[in-house]
Curated annotation (Swiss-Prot):
It holds the Pfam family Adenylsucc_synt. CDD domains: AdSS (cd03108). Homodimer. HAMAP family: Adenylosucc_synth (MF_00011). Plays an important role in the de novo pathway of purine nucleotide biosynthesis. Catalyzes the first committed step in the biosynthesis of AMP from IMP. Keywords: Cytoplasm, GTP-binding, Ligase, Magnesium, Metal-binding, Nucleotide-binding, Purine biosynthesis. It comes from the Bacteria. It comes from Brucella anthropi (strain ATCC 49188 / DSM 6882 / CCUG 24695 / JCM 21032 / LMG 3331 / NBRC 15819 / NCTC 12168 / Alc 37). It catalyses: IMP + L-aspartate + GTP = N(6)-(1,2-dicarboxyethyl)-AMP + GDP + phosphate + 2 H(+). Substrate binds at V298, V299, T300, G301, R302, K303, R304. This is Adenylosuccinate synthetase.
Amino acid sequence: MANVVVVGSQWGDEGKGKIVDWLSERADVIVRYQGGHNAGHTLVIDGVSYKLSLLPSGLVRGKLSVIGNGVVVDPHHFVAETEKLRAQGIDINPDVLRIAENAPLILSIHRDLDAMREGSNSGLKIGTTKRGIGPAYEDKVGRRAIRVIDLAEPETLQPKVERLLAHHNLLRRGMGLEEIAVETILTELTSVADQILPYIDQVWRVLDERRKAGDRILFEGAQGALLDNDHGTYPFVTSSNTVAGQAAAGSGLGPTAIGYVLGITKAYTTRVGEGPFPTELNDEIGEFLGTKGHEFGVVTGRKRRCGWFDAVIVRQTVRTSGITGIALTKLDVLDGLDEIKICVAYELDGKRIDYLPSSMGAQARVKPIYETLPGWSETTAGARSWNDLPAQAVKYVRHIEELIGAPVAMLSTSPEREDTILVTDPFHD
């Protein structure tokens, strides 16, 4: 049976939470493989809302949930999020939750640095959540990170913290911040160690054993492929790789173990924060999409920018992530529009192109080339079969398939998990 990677095919906020929850009921193991607690989503089960930003979605269904080595872990947020779920009646214990022992930790110094940089970025606002994600990844790449396993070896922790602070205190002096004492970070770590250590494991071994046993594994991506540090709209990206290939590197399970890549794709386009957005609408249509689609960030509460569906960027993501099929979400938000536009190509300096260029300047200059389709007055909300959809809505979906070069495997027509049209089961071989 196939294992499934879920990846956002746009700039995040595509509705992955509902789809992951829908799939997690069919999965045996759910794995987070990148990011941190900077991208949140809400699950609604039996009328109860669960807000998650670090923990895998499978926890609310009692499935084995794994935080992979590709995730940066804020230990204090981990404790807070687990306590919040327990208060809602979710049983969390080492039988259902594992953390990769080689995952890097987010510390208070990372949050300080993140906030300071974002506040003084010389006009270039990346739009980070100021939760320390980027600086934590920097320390990982710089080979000075404190990792989860270090909490189990307190006798070796002090020299590692000293080495880390030799770097950070140099930065803090340059930014006019007070230096941090080694004892401060040691206390920060040791105060939470006992609440973290029961969950640590060599998760690559756990996943390999579960794969060999025939378990279905769901890899839960955060954010979107266009925020990928390599393939996204750099520098307006996140600090990790968000494309589907990261599922292997960020979990320790080899790429041949990954079968189906499901790209979660919104029926229009949104983006939070700064960066290029060729199809952005700063008019009443953009306001309509934002209001009807409730486009506000789960973690930050920031209003999302809205625009028409951009087939160029999704087609590009289909290739860079090897997307097998897409889950098209929020189709119901388009109900009632007289006409709907799809960006099919760009114009750059007088030339037509079918890709998003890599350079920041070129990305800012591209202009969308649209095709206009008739809208529909009937509702798609709550549809659970193709026969429930208006004819023009079906034509819209089919045209998207043609333009991006990937079929629709699932179609979501409301926030309710049951309002889903299944075309192809991603877990089916």
